[in-house]
Curated annotation (Swiss-Prot):
Chain's gene name: era
Lineage, highest ranks first: Bacteria, Pseudomonadati, Pseudomonadota, Alphaproteobacteria, Rickettsiales
Record InterPro entries: G_ERA_dom, GTP-bd, GTPase_Era-like, KH_dom-like_a/b, KH_dom_type_2, KH_sf_prok-type, P-loop_NTPase, Small_GTP-bd
Stated name of the protein: GTPase Era
PROSITE patterns assigned to the protein according to its UniProt record, in alphabetical order: G_ERA, KH_TYPE_2
Bilayer topology annotation: Peripheral membrane protein
Sequence segments annotated as region (G1): 15-22
Species: Rickettsia typhi (strain ATCC VR-144 / Wilmington)
């Protein structure tokens, strides 16, 4: 039997908040691995996705959006995003083609030059007509002449196959780091916490989702192969608890049901989910929470 030649490539996806990084990762992997919401700064840590295409294993890093950080948490998120560049063979800079390049976008482009990084630019959301697309293309061709440009739609999948073909062509002969059916190296308890946090983002209004985090305290496989999950929603103020619980606990029950359904779809087994709310003043200043969030 002839051993298959294995190739590997690591790819970092970086860009502004809500530019489509997580949507692209999910599209490529074929599973909803990275949470997606309309709110900015949803992704807080590096989410690793893995896809193996015949002889080539592609390891993708979805990163927090780049923005002007203020508090300790935001600074850690942005620092985490930039640090991912150093472990990647290829950098994909995703740009929202529906918006003009703003000051932060130009700062990111300048940073690539300072770091001697030649990114691949992905002009995302081309499924919607944009009056800025041609101007963005023209600017990038002048400012980064060595970089390739791929107009794509991460949401609809347009040109993602072309992008994957290019990524695959850049892979080098190297043993795979993961099994050929792995889609991530993240612990299931971490993924479960992210799923619940996504539902909190989607179901809580205004700024409250940014003031909380979720930790999986118990992840137990039962004899019938179902999973029991205990999670704690950590908030910084007592006044937030009533909002999360809702009248007679209806809000947290609804969030729990939606989270459980997504977990069952991803884990392919029944899930028993129990949610608790805990007040932990100034949790954003505690190192233990950053270690749990992997930032």
């Amino acid at each position: 039997m002839i051993n298959q030649i294995q190739k590997t490539i690591s790819v970092c996806i970086i860009g502004r908040p809500n530019s489509g990084k997580s949507t692209l990762l999910n599209r490529i992997i074929g599973e909803k691995l990275s949470i997606v919401t309309p709110k900015v700064q949803t992704t807080r840590s590096i989410i690793t996705g893995i896809i193996t295409l015949k002889d080539t294993q592609i390891i993708l890093y979805d990163t927090p959006g780049i923005f002007e950080p203020k508090g300790m948490l935001e600074k850690a998120m942005v620092r985490c995003a930039w640090s991912s560049l150093y472990s990647a063979d290829l950098v994909l800079s995703i740009i929202d083609s529906l918006k003009p390049l703003d000051d932060m976008a130009h700062n990111i482009l300048n940073q690539f030059c300072l770091l001697n990084i030649v990114p691949i630019f992905l002009l995302n959301k081309i499924d919607i007509e944009s009056k800025y697309l041609n101007d963005i293309k023209a600017f990038l061709k002048i400012s980064h002449p060595k970089s390739l440009l791929f107009p794509i739609s991460a949401l609809c999948g347009k040109n993602v196959d072309v992008l994957l073909k290019y990524i695959k062509s850049k892979a080098k002969v190297s043993p795979w780091l993961y099994a050929d059916d792995d889609i991530t190296n993240l612990p299931m308890r971490f993924i479960a916490a992210e799923i619940t946090r996504e539902q909190l983002f989607l179901n809580l209004q205004q700024e409250l989702p940014y003031k909380l985090t979720v930790q999986t305290e118990k992840f137990e496989e039962l004899k019938d192969k179902s999973i029991k999950i205990n999670q704690v929603i950590v908030i910084s103020r007592e006044s937030y608890k009533a909002i999360i619980l809702g009248k007679n606990g209806t809000k947290i029950k609804d969030i729990g049901v939606k989270s459980r359904i997504q977990m069952e779809q991803l884990f392919c087994v029944p899930v028993h989910l129990f949610l608790f709310v805990k007040v932990h003043a100034l949790w954003e200043n505690k190192q233990e929470f950053y270690q749990y969030m992997k930032i």
